Design a protein with these regions (language model features):
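Secondary-structure boundary motif
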Residues: 2-3, 69, 147, 151
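Conserved donor NDP-sugar-binding/catalytic core segment of glycosyltransferases
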Residues: 1-25
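Phenylalanine-focused residue identity feature
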Residues: 11-14, 28, 42-43, 53, ...
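C-terminal subregions of glycosyltransferases and related glycan-biosynthesis enzymes
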Residues: 46-48, 74-75, 100-190
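Short, intrinsically disordered low-complexity segments
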Residues: 22, 60-61, 180, 184
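Acceptor/aglycone-binding surface of glycosyltransferases and processive sugar-polymer synthases
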Residues: 18-35, 48-49
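Proteins with a high burden of low-complexity, intrinsically disordered sequence enriched in S/T/G/P/A and R
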Residues: 1-8, 56, 182-190
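Conserved nucleotide-sugar donor-binding catalytic segment
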Residues: 34-114
């Protein structure tokens, strides 16, 4: 994180505890079925499946400076910051569990209450549109990233983002464009 000119994010796995501090599981990444790339190609997988949690990451000053002006419409701040690092700098994953994260009924995100009757009813009532809506939301992140960092993007990165932007309006073409960019079964949009 000490590199000053390159935006950098380091994140780790974590274990979970409940509202009373009782350990509820081992690796969160394993229990949640997260597919975190080991090859360093974080952007396409982050776009498909947000797997960076702010509670288990650190950023350097350069990434902080880039991230202070969060645009309206971002999906989650921690994922936005991770996408920024993946596009403009470096992302590093530590597979060890560096913290214990508390999940409780008041969490804004996470799995607490996901199996309650109300949550199951909400999921059923949303029906099949959920996957399409999530894909559209994640593709909108591409437009926001491209606008936010237009002057900083290398030409090849801008071309990749432009292709993904076009995919927003393409139905099956969107799937094809995503697969060409490395977003497929290993990081299927969910």
């Amino acid at each position: 994180l000490r590199e000053t000119d390159v935006p950098k994010l380091v994140f780790s796995d974590f274990s979970t505890i409940d509202g009373d501090g009782v350990r509820t599981g081992g690796s969160y990444a394993a229990s949640a079925g997260l597919r975190i790339p080991q090859d360093g190609d974080f952007f396409p997988k982050l776009l498909a499946q947000p797997y960076v949690f702010g509670c288990a990451c650190g950023i350097n000053r350069r990434l902080l400076e880039l991230s202070l002006d969060l645009p309206d419409g971002i999906e989650m701040y921690d994922c936005w910051i991770a996408l920024t690092a993946a596009l403009l700098g470096k992302v590093e994953y530590l597979p060890e569990q560096t913290i214990q994260h508390r999940f409780h009924s008041s969490n804004a995100t996470g799995r607490a209450g996901q199996n309650s009757f109300l949550m199951r009813l909400k999921r059923v009532s949303r029906g099949f549109g959920t996957q399409r809506e999530n894909t559209a939301l994640r593709l909108r992140q591409v437009t926001l990233l491209r606008r936010q960092y237009a002057e900083l993007l290398p030409p090849e990165t801008d071309a990749m983002l432009a292709a993904l932007e076009r995919a927003q309006h393409g139905g099956p073409a969107a799937v094809s464009a995503l697969k060409k960019r490395g977003v497929g079964r290993g990081g299927a949009m969910q």
